[in-house]
Regions:
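Cofactor-binding active-site loop characterized by glycine-rich and histidine/acidic residues
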Residues: 13-17, 22-122
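Conserved two-metal-ion catalytic palm core of "right-hand" nucleic acid polymerases
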Residues: 1
Length: 122
């Protein structure tokens, strides 16, 4: 079951507060809360077998793709928001703005050549 809008925003607020208290000592990149309204209908179409390529500003994406909040929190506390990837959920992130685009194109081409039914989302 997908997390609610309220739960996602509360998670991000918690990250912000932890950062301000000095509990997170790595760079964090928060999302504009208004983006969530646009993402919710898109993520209704994203299936578990689909691949998601995103950036360092992917808190909403990661939660909507099914990453357990406690796992994501642990990663962010230890490493910040850059570089989170999850092979099991087929999530690839890049710390470089736009850096995942060529990787996503290659992944999509590979899936198409193999006749796969998975989709690639960027």
């Amino acid at each position: 079951m997908a997390p609610t809008k309220a739960a996602i925003l509360a998670f991000q607020d918690d990250i912000k507060e932890r950062f301000l208290r000095g509990e997170i000592r790595h760079p964090i990149h928060l999302c504009d809360p208004g983006q969530l309204d646009h993402l919710l209908p898109i993520f209704e179409d994203i299936q578990p077998q689909d691949w998601l390529f995103t950036s360092y500003r992917g808190i909403f994406h990661w939660l909507l793709k099914g990453v357990p909040p406690e796992r994501l929190l642990k990663f962010i506390v230890e490493h910040g928001t850059m570089g989170f990837c999850d092979k099991e959920r087929r999530i690839v992130s890049s710390a470089i703005g736009g850096g995942c685009l060529p990787i996503a194109v290659g992944g999509a081409m590979g899936l198409k050549r193999q006749g796969g039914k998975e989709r690639v989302w960027v």
